[in-house]
């Protein structure tokens, strides 16, 4: 996993931690059973502990831990793993077009980018700063 993905997961974990309300109610909402207003009952509101308190936090923490483990594994492996070829790069399978018995179509004929736009693929490296800036502008990253 590359660093951009690890940073995105860390941002997701931070946003979940800061936006997860401690008063968030889990389970079924509303009054249940005799708490709806039985006869002679005192009107005292007792709030039990939420059923699923912090479940989103546990999921986000697990996702961030997985992202960190993936980034660490990627660093440990280093150059021993073969990196997948991107849309603008040639891989070992791309030499099949010139092989005898092939239909001779070029690489760009069946490409998604060739059919949808006249430009090449663009990098999405600005997604994490954009996400952080948007969350900051919406004031969602405050405690």
UniProtKB/Swiss-Prot annotation:
<keyword id="KW-0034">Amyloid</keyword>
<keyword id="KW-0325">Glycoprotein</keyword>
<dbReference type="GO" id="GO:0006606">
    <property type="term" value="P:protein import into nucleus"/>
</dbReference>
<keyword id="KW-0640">Prion</keyword>
<protein>
    <recommendedName>
        <fullName>Shadow of prion protein</fullName>
    </recommendedName>
</protein>
<dbReference type="GO" id="GO:0005886">
    <property type="term" value="C:plasma membrane"/>
</dbReference>
<keyword id="KW-0336">GPI-anchor</keyword>
<feature type="lipid moiety-binding region" description="GPI-anchor amidated serine">
    <location>
        <position position="117"/>
    </location>
</feature>
<dbReference type="GO" id="GO:0098552">
    <property type="term" value="C:side of membrane"/>
</dbReference>
<feature type="propeptide" description="Removed in mature form">
    <location>
        <begin position="118"/>
        <end position="143"/>
    </location>
</feature>
<dbReference type="InterPro" id="IPR029238">
    <property type="entry name" value="Shadoo"/>
</dbReference>
<keyword id="KW-0472">Membrane</keyword>
<keyword id="KW-0449">Lipoprotein</keyword>
<feature type="signal peptide">
    <location>
        <begin position="1"/>
        <end position="24"/>
    </location>
</feature>
<dbReference type="GO" id="GO:0003676">
    <property type="term" value="F:nucleic acid binding"/>
</dbReference>
<feature type="glycosylation site" description="N-linked (GlcNAc...) asparagine">
    <location>
        <position position="103"/>
    </location>
</feature>
<keyword id="KW-1003">Cell membrane</keyword>
<comment type="similarity">
    <text>Belongs to the SPRN family.</text>
</comment>
<dbReference type="Pfam" id="PF14999">
    <property type="entry name" value="Shadoo"/>
</dbReference>
<comment type="function">
    <text>Prion-like protein that has PrP(C)-like neuroprotective activity. May act as a modulator for the biological actions of normal and abnormal PrP.</text>
</comment>
<dbReference type="GO" id="GO:0005634">
    <property type="term" value="C:nucleus"/>
</dbReference>
<keyword id="KW-0732">Signal</keyword>
